[in-house]
UniProtKB/Swiss-Prot annotation:
Domain of life: Bacteria
Active site residues according to the UniProt entry: 9 (tele-phosphohistidine intermediate), 82 (proton donor/acceptor)
UniProt signal peptide: none
UniProt-recorded name of the protein: Probable phosphoglycerate mutase GpmB
InterPro entries: His_Pase_superF_clade-1 (IPR013078), His_PPase_superfam (IPR029033), PG/BPGM_mutase_AS (IPR001345), PGM_Phosphatase (IPR050275), Phosphoglycerate_mutase_GpmB (IPR023086)
Organism: Citrobacter koseri (strain ATCC BAA-895 / CDC 4225-83 / SGSC4696)
Pathway involvement of the protein, from the record: Carbohydrate degradation; glycolysis; pyruvate from D-glyceraldehyde 3-phosphate: step 3/5
Residues bound to substrate: 8-15, 21-22, 58, 60, 82-85, 104-105, 151-152
Lineage, broadest ranks: Bacteria, Pseudomonadati, Pseudomonadota, Gammaproteobacteria, Enterobacterales
Amino acid sequence: MLQVYLVRHGETQWNAERRIQGQSDSPLTAKGEQQAMQVGERARTLGITHIVSSDLGRTRRTAEIIAQACGCDITFDARLRELDMGVLEKRHIDTLTEEEENWRRQLVNGTVDGRIPDGESMQELSDRVNAALASCLELPQGSRPLLVSHGIALGCLVSTILGLPAWAERRLRLRNCSISRVDYQESLWLAPGWVVETAGDVSHLDAPALDELQR
């Protein structure tokens, strides 16, 4: 049975400032660096063999810190990027106009084909993150990969594995540097395919972590 660990990046400057990141970027805070080191300490005990990361800066840095702890190489995969939030990226969430807030709500509340102008839909996000996960099935027997990605992207992935719509990710609380695990099982008795073993574990962190845009 293949076990895949899913890690959200460490806290960033824009997380702390309540700014919308999407595929734009901001650096890890000192707290975010510490969170990544604590993930690394946990990862060292898990037998991780591969690290696959979104190619955005905040995930790259998180993956680098984890890789130093567990001695793994990193592969970068753009399919693990965060949801493209279009024209709302870099904006402070409390400064959105009524129209802009409506765009955001339509997207995250599951409106069919909802998207922010110049951004992507939840279905497009779901398609690419699930394809990235499926690539883990091509790794050598005995592999145990760890994927470093983003809050909405990982929430979407876990939701769809559970058979829920992609926008159900808003019902999952995946805090900065939380660890989730999904397994691929082939069984005559259990549901074949991907199953969720754990989601949003923060027991390795020594201080409270942020949810998406939450203080």
